[in-house]
C-alpha cells in the first residue's frame, strides 16, 4: 500500500478540521444565574485551529462536522463564515426534537 499525496497546487484546502463545534454563552462579568444578556461565541479545539490558521496566516481552511438544521446550527455557521472558514463540508441534519443540549458551569460561564 502506498500513500499518494497530491501537490499543494491541486488541493482546495490547506487544512480541514474534523470535530465538534459548540456555541458558548458568556454572561460577561455577571453571574450566569442573574444574567439576561449574553455574548455568543463559537468554539471547539479542532475548529479553533482552523480559524487561527485562517486569521493569522491566511490559509484556506474548512470544517467537516454535522449540525442540526435549526436556528442554533445556522447561528454557529454564521460565526464560522465570519471567521473566514469554509462551511461547505457541514452535514445538515433535520432537528427532530430529541437532541440534547449539554451545559457545563465553571466560574459563572457556560461551556
Please identify what each model-predicted range represents.
Residues 13-16, 44, 48, 71, ...:
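Conserved active-site and cofactor/substrate-binding residues in soluble primary-metabolism enzymes
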Residues 39, 54, 62-64:
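Short, conserved beta-strand segments within well-ordered enzyme catalytic domains
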Residues 31-51:
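Short catalytic helix/loop segments, enriched in acidic residues and glycine
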Residues 48-60:
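Alpha-helix C-terminal capping segments
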